[in-house]
Regions:
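Acidic, proline/glycine-enriched N-terminal capping motif
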Residues: 1-154
C-alpha cells in the first residue's frame, strides 16, 4: 500500500457490464445463511471480477492511500427490439438503458469498486467523488471504462 502523488488509473474491459448482485438469505438445516449469488444475468460474477482485476493490474494499478474520484462508464448492447435493421435506435426507443432489467447504476459502480479493493486503493472510504454512466453501445463494443484519479488532478 502506498501514497502516490498524481495517481491516475484508466482502463477498459470489453465485457458485458454486470451489476453487483444483492445478498440472498436462506435457511439450511435450521441455520440462517447469507450469500451472494455468483450467476448474474447469465454470467459468472466471479469471472467478471477477475476480468476487471486483470485489466486494472495490466494498466498499472497500485493500492494507494490518497483521496480519489472514480468514473465508471458502462456500455451495453441494446435489445434487438429497440434497433432498426441498420443498427440505429428506433425513434420510439429510450436513449439510455433505464429499464429495471438493465441494472442500477449504483450496483454497476459497487461491482467495479469491490473488485478493485486492495488492488487500486486501500479502502473505499478514500473516494470523495463517484460517477457512473450507463449508455447503449451502438457504435462500439459493450464494456466498462474505469477511470480512478487522485482528487485535484486535471
Amino acid at each position: 500500500v502506498k501514497a502516490v502523488e498524481n495517481y491516475l488509473l484508466s482502463f477498459e474491459v470489453k465485457t458485458k457490464p454486470l451489476p453487483q448482485p444483492r445478498p440472498r438469505f436462506a435457511t439450511i438445516a435450521g441455520h440462517p445463511r447469507v450469500y451472494t449469488p455468483n450467476n448474474v444475468m447469465g454470467r459468472s460474477f466471479n469471472l467478471y471480477k477477475k476480468e476487471i482485476v486483470a485489466a486494472a493490474v495490466k494498466a498499472g494499478a497500485e493500492a494507494v492511500v490518497v483521496p480519489l474520484e472514480a468514473q465508471i462508464r458502462c456500455r451495453m448492447t441494446p435489445p434487438r427490439s429497440l434497433l432498426r435493421k441498420d443498427g440505429t435506435l428506433k425513434s420510439s426507443a429510450r436513449t439510455y438503458p433505464i429499464a429495471q432489467r438493465d441494472g442500477d447504476g449504483d450496483n454497476f459502480l459497487k461491482a467495479v469498486l469491490d473488485s478493485l479493493l486492495g488492488i487500486a486503493f486501500k479502502d473505499d472510504s478514500q473516494f470523495v467523488g463517484l460517477s457512473v454512466t450507463k449508455e447503449w453501445a451502438l457504435d462500439s463494443e459493450e464494456g466498462i471504462h474505469v477511470t480512478i484519479r487522485e482528487v485535484g488532478l486535471a
